């Protein structure tokens, strides 16, 4: 039984439709085909009821930052018969891999070889293959998470060789959240890095995904080739 009011449900549904429309407009303006860009609804600040309302509004790709939050929501969704694709976009500690793996469809935040090795081992034991993105620290800021650009090629080769990980692309956060030319330059650099990796790894590895863009800079991300937008606050405007 959902505790969210009918008014809240209507507001979330309206927010979802507005974001869909805005993203479609940005995709068209960028000269890209409809359907090239997926919206991952980031529900890290809301409870299971509001997350469920978002799913029921049509957002079936859901993102969480914390593994513990994902576990609880995934269990609740499963009990209700709802089947979203869960995207873990925050840091995953190695001691939380086993509990997380059955739920995760995508991991956006693969940021070390140690984590990749542990993930591959656990995925092998569970007889599954996990879709992963390498998180790159495009800002070169030591306080930020993600792989340094200088290590990206070497680690990508090692991850691509792991049989239970399916390397599909890169994830990055812009150093500024307000969008504009600064964001476009950084997103363009991420796209260029992905293109270089694709050449390096060859046709056996399909790097077709770029997880770039959030509520404040998704237009710039779309213009520079993003395929996954991590949208949170815009979907819950008027509620949070």
What are these regions (language model features)?
Residues 1-216, 224, 236:
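Conserved alpha/beta-domain cores
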Residues 226-240:
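Gly/Pro- and small hydrophobic-enriched strand-loop and loop-to-helix capping segments
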């Amino acid at each position: 039984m959902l505790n969210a009011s009918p008014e809240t449900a209507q507001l979330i549904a309206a927010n979802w439709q507005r974001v869909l429309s805005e993203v479609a407009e940005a995709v068209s303006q960028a000269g890209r085909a409809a359907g090239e860009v997926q919206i991952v609804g980031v529900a890290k600040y809301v409870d299971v009821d509001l997350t469920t309302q978002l799913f029921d509004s049509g957002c079936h790709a859901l993102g969480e930052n914390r593994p513990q939050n994902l576990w609880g929501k995934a269990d609740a969704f499963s009990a209700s018969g709802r089947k979203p694709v869960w995207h873990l976009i925050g840091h995953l500690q190695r001691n939380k891999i086993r509990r997380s793996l059955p739920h995760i469809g995508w991991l956006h935040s693969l940021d070390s070889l140690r984590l990749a090795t542990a993930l591959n081992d656990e995925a092998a034991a569970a007889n599954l293959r996990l879709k992963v993105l390498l998180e790159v620290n495009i800002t070169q800021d030591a306080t930020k998470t993600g792989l340094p650009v200088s290590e990206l090629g070497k680690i990508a080769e090692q991850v691509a060789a792991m049989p239970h990980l399916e390397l599909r692309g890169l994830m990055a956060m812009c150093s500024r959240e307000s969008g504009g030319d600064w964001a476009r330059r950084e997103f363009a650099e991420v796209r260029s890095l992905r293109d270089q990796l694709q050449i390096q790894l060859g046709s056996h590895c399909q790097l077709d995904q770029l997880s770039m863009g959030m509520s404040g800079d998704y237009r710039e991300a779309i213009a520079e080739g993003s395929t996954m937008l991590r949208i949170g606050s815009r979907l819950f405007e008027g509620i949070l």
